[in-house]
């Protein structure tokens, strides 16, 4: 529905979701969606090829939902992917898509309270597959209290030839001298 334009969204914790369109340097508000059932919306990601929009909601509910993006740029067909009665053990936060083909791949959700990442099928009904955590090695400390994730699954540079995973780490632990939150950059090869 965006006809080759770039799009972005804003998710307000207890309010609406805004859909924006970028054309060169111009930014236009296309639509605002009422996310009335959300207690505290956190992360979001578009799946362009499958016309899906995913939102995570933390605190009381701990839910990940998918919506279909219609040709009129409306969010429709709300579907509950997972919640704390299922496979979510902390607050669902960041969301990212790992594409394995045009329409297939995985939805990855970071969980702040449990410092884990859940893997779901990219296609409806978004079946839970597994979870993982990022452990300490000779280069980094364990990722804890994570609030976000992003994945690029194509050549990034010689250090990340098959792609890169960027995760927010709430605090440094172990022998690290920097105690503040930071970002970890990991090779996509480590997830395969």
Language-model regions: role of each:
Residues 40-42, 60, 91, 113, ...:
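Beta-rich catalytic cores
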Residues 148-192:
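Blade-level signature of beta-propeller repeat domains, shared across WD40, Kelch, NHL, RCC1
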Residues 81-93, 127-155:
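Conserved blade-ending motifs and adjacent loop-strand segments that build the rim/top face
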Residues 13-14, 56-60, 111-112, 168-170:
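Short loop/turn segments immediately following the C-termini of beta-strands
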Residues 1-8, 12:
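Single conserved hydrophobic/aromatic residue that forms the stacking wall/gate
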Residues 5, 42-50, 93-103, 148-160:
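Structural signature of eukaryotic scaffold interfaces centered on beta-propeller domains
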Residues 86-132:
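Loop/turn-rich, solvent-exposed surfaces of beta-rich toroidal or solenoidal domains
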Residues 19-27, 66-74, 119-127, 186-192:
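Short loop/turn segments immediately following beta-strands, especially the blade-tip
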